[in-house]
Amino acid sequence: MDNIVERVKKIVAEQLGVNEADIKNESSFVDDLGADSLDTVELVMALEEEFECEIPDDQAEKITTVQQAVDYILAGKK
């Protein structure tokens, strides 16, 4: 689980140009990390590539925090 959290945070840091140390599990991509709609689309694509999964658009819209991304990935790995 920690490995997934770290991987998600690394991707978020790379995609949004923020310091990984500033990213918390409850960080909102838009409100806390300054992402815009294009950033969030690119972030979802990067997560799909990293974790070899597909995140449907209706689900991607619900993923607004680091923890929600981690939870979605964990649910898909079961």
From Swiss-Prot:
Q: Which family does it belong to?
A: Belongs to the acyl carrier protein (ACP) family.
Q: What processing steps or modifications follow its translation? A: 4'-phosphopantetheine is transferred from CoA to a specific serine of apo-ACP by AcpS. This modification is essential for activity because fatty acids are bound in thioester linkage to the sulfhydryl of the prosthetic group.
Question: Which named protein is this?
Answer: Acyl carrier protein
Q: What is its main location?
A: cytoplasm
Could you tell me which pathway this protein works in? Lipid metabolism; fatty acid biosynthesis
Which GO terms fall under biological process for this protein? lipid A biosynthetic process
A Pfam family found in this protein is PP-binding
- Show the InterPro entries listed in the entry: ACP, ACP-like_sf, PP-bd_ACP, Ppantetheine_attach_site
Cite the PROSITE patterns for this sequence. CARRIER, PHOSPHOPANTETHEINE
- Modification O-(pantetheine 4'-phosphoryl)serine occurs at: 37
Q: What does this protein do?
A: Carrier of the growing fatty acid chain in fatty acid biosynthesis.
For whether the record's keyword set contains Lipid metabolism, the answer is: yes
Q: What NCBIfam families is this protein classified in?
A: acyl_carrier (TIGR00517), PRK00982.1-2 (NF002148), PRK00982.1-3 (NF002149), PRK00982.1-4 (NF002150), PRK00982.1-5 (NF002151)
Carrier domain segment(s): 2-77
The species this protein belongs to is Dechloromonas aromatica (strain RCB)
GO MF terms listed in the record are: acyl binding; acyl carrier activity
Q: Where in the cell is it found?
A: Cytoplasm
Q: What gene makes this protein?
A: acpP
Keywords assigned:
Cytoplasm, Fatty acid biosynthesis, Fatty acid metabolism, Lipid biosynthesis, Lipid metabolism, Phosphopantetheine, Phosphoprotein
Q: Which GO terms describe its cellular component?
A: cytosol; membrane
